[in-house]
């Protein structure tokens, strides 16, 4: 089991049509993320798709037949549009368009990641440069506060425990967030809540 403060589940997904008793006779279409995707990196590591070669270098053994998508929403729409497709996304990105597969009988949920019964998870990381401005530090303080972590929890992710109330004050300065297509929707919600 992997433990982290803020965690996402990497839920393998498949389209809903087969779950409702659809046709199971087609060839499975493997849908993967692009090289460099943090979601892909976590998936290949957690599921043993990545191995070391004789030189000790990591090798990604994703099938060459995989259809590559460049972000979470494209992954979801591609899987949803093909009843034979299977792919992977972050649990917090899951919606009614696709469904998550059980792992060892456990449903993909924040509760099951937290209690250890859903064993596939990874941390979300926020990185900054050294010497944050006062405004950027205030936003980070908000993210790590009880208020910010409520946004994290409400969005389906696992919040950091033992947080304190936010005591800063948003200056109204422009907040810019960038990065992974898995993390960006959550960061945008945090930004929106912070700047209210």
Regions found by a protein language model. Name each.
Residues 1-196:
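Exported/periplasmic ABC-transporter solute-binding proteins
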């Amino acid at each position: 089991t992997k433990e982290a403060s803020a965690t996402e589940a990497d839920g393998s997904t498949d389209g809903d049509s087969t779950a409702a008793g659809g046709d199971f006779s087609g060839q499975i279409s493997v849908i993967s993320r692009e090289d460099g995707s943090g979601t892909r990196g976590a998936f290949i590591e957690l599921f043993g798709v990545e191995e070391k070669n004789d030189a000790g270098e990591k090798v990604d053994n994703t099938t060459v037949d995989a259809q590559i998508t460049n972000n979470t929403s494209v992954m979801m729409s591609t899987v949803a549009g093909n009843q034979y497709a299977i792919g992977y996304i972050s649990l917090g990105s899951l919606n009614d368009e696709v469904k998550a597969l059980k792992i060892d009988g456990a449903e993909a949920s924040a509760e099951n990641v937290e209690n250890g019964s859903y064993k596939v998870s990874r941390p979300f990381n926020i990185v900054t440069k050294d010497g944050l401005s006062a405004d950027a530090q205030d936003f980070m303080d908000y993210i790590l506060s009880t208020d910010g972590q409520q946004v994290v929890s409400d969005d389906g992710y696992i919040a950091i425990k033992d947080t304190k109330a936010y005591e800063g004050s948003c200056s109204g300065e422009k907040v810019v967030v960038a990065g992974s297509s898995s993390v960006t929707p959550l960061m945008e919600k945090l930004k929106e809540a912070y700047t209210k």
